[in-house]
Regions:
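Hydrophobic targeting/anchoring helices
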Residues: 1-146, 249-253, 257-260, 268, ...
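Short, well-ordered secondary-structure micro-motifs within conserved domains or adaptor modules
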Residues: 10-14, 175-198
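A short helix->loop->beta-strand "cap" motif at the edges of active sites that frequently abuts
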Residues: 30-32, 215-218, 309
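A short, well-structured beta->alpha microelement
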Residues: 153-177
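Structural motif
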Residues: 182-192, 220, 311-313, 363
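C-terminal beta-strand-rich structural cap/linker in extracellular carbohydrate-active enzymes
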Residues: 183-187, 385-398
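A glycine-rich, often tryptophan-bearing local segment used as a flexible ligand/cofactor-contacting loop or short
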Residues: 196-272
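Catalytic beta-strand/loop cores that center a nucleophilic Ser/Cys/Thr
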Residues: 252-307, 315-326, 332-380, 384-389
Length: 398
């Protein structure tokens, strides 16, 4: 919020549950510093005989580190009863190593805009005022009804994109803002503030978005994008997306398109059937749509071209390293950016690359608790093989 810079607030300190909560804090402007309080809190529920605070600390740090590499907070800390840590020297050793890693990270990344392959806007009814928190329920707690959508935001929190959050009112006030974007993402259930609800009855909204895509922009819809029953359609961008939801009004329509096309750019790195989380029922495809995944004649993923632009439909995408790669490839494909794949890129989706070109540095980070092998691609497309220890981060000069 712009008010942070005018109310005399010195700093914002927040608890870090994942990458989204980290970005919610670190993206705040107009304060002297931002600080993240990491888990575990120094309370007896973790710091007791037989407890494993190191495990929780590792999980929390590795999850948040992706986001810190995109937009660092200024300080890190913990909260609770310090005395409880005295019986866990291995925890103190891990925190020392974590702090040293943070200092190096901060030195290389603070104040430097990292390499961003595309400009991405998450479109909902709130826009910037709920940046990163739009799919968050009580500080990133798991909710069955929400995790399939929150995964999109979590993946974006540590991905090499220039991410912004825009509202439908922003588009109505100035449709020209879309010209500065590469792709729009609309994610959530229909008839909610996440996807817009009744705002789709305003023709100016659908006209602006259709124009953006028709002229070459990308659109990714997750769940029930543009979902609102109006003028014979539930998905108001059904013709653009190439899919529609059967709500009972078109049961007598023949639906012939069920053939899957799994050999697609978007799915090239998948190692197992795609995890759509809760997924969606009753989604069908139009005849000129390319279905990537359907299960029991319910479309879970599809792509469709609209004018010069491209659209991707996904029924849900919980956060995982593999799903993060699927979203990455979806964004590239929707923006005709396949040629940009091998720029600051890791062939292994468990490993990520972040480049700080202005600073002349880049890093490769292993997001897992196991050794990993990968091929790292530099900005010019050249590459080198790399083996990494669990959780390791390596820094290089460009």
């Amino acid at each position: 919020m712009e008010e942070f810079s005018t109310i005399g607030l010195d700093a914002v300190v927040g608890s870090v549950g994942n990458g989204s909560t980290l970005r919610l804090i670190s993206d705040i402007e107009g304060v002297r510093y931002t600080e993240g309080r990491f888990l575990p809190y120094f309370f007896p529920d973790t710091f007791h005989e037989g407890g494993d605070p190191v495990k929780e600390a590792k999980e929390n740090w590795i999850t948040a580190r992706r986001a810190i590499l995109r937009k660092p907070i200024d300080r890190i800390g913990y909260g609770g009863y310090l005395k409880l840590t005295l019986d866990f020297p291995e925890f103190l050793d891990y925190v020392e190593n974590m702090c040293n890693e943070f200092r190096e990270l901060y030195t290389n990344a603070k104040g430097i805009t990292p390499y961003c392959v595309k400009k991405v806007a998450v479109l909902n009814s709130w826009g910037k005022i709920r940046s990163w928190g739009c799919h968050m329920v009580h500080h990133a707690l798991y909710q069955k009804q929400n995790y399939s959508y929150a995964g999109i935001i979590e993946a974006l929190s540590g991905a090499p994109f220039d991410v912004r959050f825009i509202s439908f009112d922003d588009i109505l006030a100035n449709p020209e803002i879309l010209k500065d974007l590469d792709v729009i993402i609309n994610v959530g259930d229909g008839d909610t503030a996440h996807t817009g609800g009744g705002i789709w009855e305003n023709p100016a909204i659908s006209a602006a978005i259709r124009e953006f895509v028709y002229n070459g922009g990308g659109f990714i819809g997750v769940g029930e994008p543009s979902g609102h029953q109006f003028q014979g359609h539930y998905l108001q961008l059904a013709d653009m997306l190439g899919v529609e939801k059967e709500t009972g009004f078109t049961l007598n329509y023949d639906k012939y398109n069920w053939e899957e096309h799994p050999d697609h750019f978007i799915l090239a790195d998948t190692t197992k059937p795609v995890d759509f989380g809760e997924g969606k029922k009753n989604i069908f495809a139009y005849e000129d749509t390319e279905i990537l995944v359907q299960r029991e004649k319910e479309v879970q993923m599809a792509v469709h071209e609209f004018g010069k632009g491209r659209c991707v439909y996904i029924s849900g995408l919980p956060y995982s390293f593999e799903n993060s790669r699927i979203l990455y490839r979806s964004i590239l494909w929707s923006t005709h950016g396949e040629k940009d794949l091998h720029q600051w890129f890791s062939s292994n989706f468990n490993v990520e690359v972040h480049a700080y070109v202005k600073n002349g540095r880049f890093c490769v980070v292993n997001n897992t608790y196991a050794r990993q092998k990968t091929v790292v691609y530099r900005g010019d497309g050249s590459s080198f093989p790399l083996e990494m220890e669990a959780n390791e981060i390596k820094w290089y000069n460009i």
